[in-house]
Amino acid sequence: MKVHYDPETDTLTIRLREERIKESDEVREGLLVDYGYDGGVVRFEVLRASKVVEKANEM
């Protein structure tokens, strides 16, 4: 698993497997799930990640 934060785009990427991505789905606003050719999850992308973390800390 690899985790990367890009401050320029405010995107947090969590890559579970090194596999080519076949399709992506926005499962909720700002959360993308990328799937491989076998249908399994390859990567999660959190858009506006700093806002998501900020809201989580408020809970």
PLM regions and their residue ranges:
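A short acidic/small-residue loop/turn micro-motif
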Residues: 20, 49-51
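Structured beta-strand/loop patches that form or line metal/cofactor-binding pockets in enzymes
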Residues: 2, 7, 14-26, 30
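Extended lipid/amphipathic-ligand handling interfaces
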Residues: 34
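A short, polar/charged loop-to-alpha-helix boundary motif
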Residues: 51-59
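Short, glycine/acidic-enriched loop or turn micro-motifs at the edges of active sites
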Residues: 9, 48
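N-terminal intrinsically disordered, cationic/polar leader segments
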Residues: 14-19, 37, 57-58
